[in-house]
């Protein structure tokens, strides 16, 4: 969901322009009270940074934060610059030859803010409430790369890029095909890596742990003591292990079948709908097991170990 964070100060100015047609005031910076009498109060920004927004105003600039960690920023810059160029052209065309230029600028700014204010959102962009609110506002919710790629070759996009001499229709179609192929290859590599990790490391390790638990149950019972805790844990781990093995087998099957889909667009959709979905099914019990399997048996450092201890390397 694409939204824009303006912050309290700029949002207040925009709302004044929409409601009154003029901005006569703005929210000013406050003081950060440290609570310590020996330290001075500090100036603080009139707004925060909102790290959940994909497109945020941060005091003196806008930040576009949606570029993937492994992607080049060049394609995003090309698209953003082309969009800005089109907007400037439309504005220039509307202002060309007007008698009262200042009033025309004023009215146009008010109209643009009013027409497009639905994209402004200053709240938590990760919340379910925002998903519902975005739907109410009529904003698109594009959930995967495969869903986003067709936007490159829509008649509207082709007209935009061709009118500014950026891309031809053939160039856009070729880029779309390349993106489909890159997506399919990336998910294929991740799926095979997941199969290797689950089959050669996690499942054998959990089997060893369940064996240890089973022996513990027998030993405690032979001693005449209550082994219900060990038995309950054994049942829980065995249940997750069963789910994981089923998803593991399914992932091997659906990944192998992907090679039979020859059309690159359909193959990308197959990886999204079948392979990625099965990967999520495999991860779910693995995440549960990571929380309850003895550290000595788990084959990888846990998130907690990586974040909070210095012996993560020793666990590899």
Where are these predicted regions, by residue range?
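Extended alpha-helical coiled-coil "stalk/arm" regions that scaffold and mediate dimerization/assembly
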Residues: 180-214, 218-221, 229, 261-264, ...
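Conserved small/polar residues in nucleotide/adenosyl-binding loops
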Residues: 308-316
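Generic long, charged, amphipathic alpha-helical segments
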Residues: 216-242, 246-247
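Charged, amphipathic alpha-helical oligomerization/scaffolding segments
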Residues: 83-86, 90, 197, 201-208, ...
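Long amphipathic alpha-helical coiled-coil segments
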Residues: 259-271, 293-307
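Active-site capping/gating regions of soluble enzymes
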Residues: 1-178
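Flexible loop/turn segments at secondary-structure boundaries
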Residues: 63, 70-74, 204-205, 210-212, ...
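Long, low-complexity or tandemly repetitive, helically biased scaffold regions used
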Residues: 250-263, 310
């Amino acid at each position: 969901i694409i939204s824009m964070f303006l912050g309290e100060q700029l949002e207040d100015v925009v709302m004044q322009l929409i409601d009154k047609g003029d901005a006569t005031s703005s929210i000013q910076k406050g003081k950060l009270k440290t609570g310590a009498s020996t330290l001075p109060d500090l100036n603080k920004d009139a707004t925060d940074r909102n790290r959940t927004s994909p497109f945020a105003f941060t005091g003196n600039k806008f930040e576009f934060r949606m570029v993937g960690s492994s992607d080049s920023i060049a394609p995003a810059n090309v698209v953003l610059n082309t969009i800005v160029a089109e907007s400037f052209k439309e504005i220039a065309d509307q202002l060309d030859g007007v008698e009262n230029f200042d009033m025309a600028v004023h009215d146009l700014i008010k109209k643009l803010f009013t027409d497009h204010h639905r994209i402004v959102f200053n709240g938590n962009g990760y919340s379910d409430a925002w998903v519902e609110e975005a739907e109410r506002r009529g904003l698109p919710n594009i959930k995967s790369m495969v869903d986003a790629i067709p936007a490159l070759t829509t008649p509207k996009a082709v007209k935009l890029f061709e009118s500014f001499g950026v891309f031809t229709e053939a160039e856009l179609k070729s880029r779309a095909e390349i993106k489909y192929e890159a997506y399919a290859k990336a998910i294929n590599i991740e799926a095979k890596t997941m199969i290797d990790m689950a089959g050669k490391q996690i499942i054998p390790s959990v089997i060893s742990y369940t064996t240890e638990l089973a022996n513990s149950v027998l030993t405690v019972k032979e001693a005449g003591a209550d082994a219900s805790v060990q038995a309950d844990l054994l049942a829980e781990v065995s249940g997750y292990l069963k789910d994981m093995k089923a998803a593991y087998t399914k992932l091997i099957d659906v990944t192998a079948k992907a090679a039979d889909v020859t059309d690159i667009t359909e193959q990308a959709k197959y990886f999204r709908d079948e392979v990625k979905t099965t990967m999520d099914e495999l991860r779910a019990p693995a995440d549960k097991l990571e929380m309850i399997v003895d550290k000595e048996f788990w084959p990888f450092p846990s998130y907690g170990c990586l974040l909070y201890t210095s012996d993560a390397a020793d666990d590899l």
